[in-house]
């Protein structure tokens, strides 16, 4: 299946309201330690969209004793804070110690995992990929409650950005942006999220901020305007983030 057809296939989640679904993948090696990596997808998709990233991380030597979690939630009709609370409630039903957990969120999922922290869920590190911490680019439509909750004017994002639990945990936040260069030059956005928004420039001090670069031989508008954002779901395009997460697992 081509990348474009794969993207169109991912839009199946737009028209229906998905229930919370959480699946854990047992570690490659048995251990008495409790170490978890929870990966949360972005808008208009489900956990399958992040399996490439999960599989890449799972095969790292230092990940052999880590338990990975795939999360699916509704991104269309449910504001992300409500989804975060539902995910936390579901995880609390599991008989696991989550005190040593890495939270990874792609796009909208980055706000979901931050909201999980705001709700009191523990983490040793939080990684966001192409997340609109200060809203998406202004030309992206936000027609339903899910994407509207991401807007820079959303009360949900304003509340999250001043939440005491979120503020206290920012020394564990690792924020990644994607920018790209095509025939029209360098663009400081990924087609959906600006570099400053993905890096959470208004959040103050965080553990680290990183920018990843993509290069195109043709104008991105000849493909899809948000193609760079979408390509951040493919491990080969975000190797700096993969390596960084690997170090966090050591």
How would you name each of these model-derived features?
Residues 2-250:
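Lipid deacylating catalytic domains
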């Amino acid at each position: 299946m081509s990348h474009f057809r794969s993207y169109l296939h991912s839009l199946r989640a737009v028209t229906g309201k998905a229930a919370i679904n959480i699946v854990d993948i047992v570690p490659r090696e048995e251990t008495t330690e409790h170490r978890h990596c929870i990966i949360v997808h972005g808008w208009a998709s489900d956990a399958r969209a992040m399996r490439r990233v999960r599989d890449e991380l799972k095969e790292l030597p230092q990940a052999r004793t880590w338990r990975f979690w795939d999360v699916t939630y509704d991104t269309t009709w449910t504001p992300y804070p409500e989804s975060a609370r539902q995910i936390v409630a579901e995880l609390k039903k599991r008989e696991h110690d989550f005190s040593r957990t890495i939270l990874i969120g792609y796009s909208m999922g980055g706000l979901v995992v931050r909201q999980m922290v705001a709700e009191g869920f523990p983490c040793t590190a939080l990684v966001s990929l192409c997340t609109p911490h200060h809203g998406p680019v202004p030309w992206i439509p936000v027609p339903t409650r899910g994407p509207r909750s991401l807007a820079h004017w959303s009360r949900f994002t304003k509340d999250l950005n001043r939440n005491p639990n979120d503020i206290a945990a920012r020394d564990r936040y690792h924020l990644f942006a994607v920018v790209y260069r095509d025939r029209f030059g360098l663009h400081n956005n990924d087609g959906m999220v600006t570099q400053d928004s993905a890096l959470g420039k208004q959040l103050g001090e965080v553990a680290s901020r990183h920018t990843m670069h993509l290069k195109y031989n043709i104008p991105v508008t000849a493909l899809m305007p948000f193609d760079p954002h979408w390509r951040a779901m493919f491990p080969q395009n975000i190797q700096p983030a993969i390596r960084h997460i690997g170090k966090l697992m050591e």
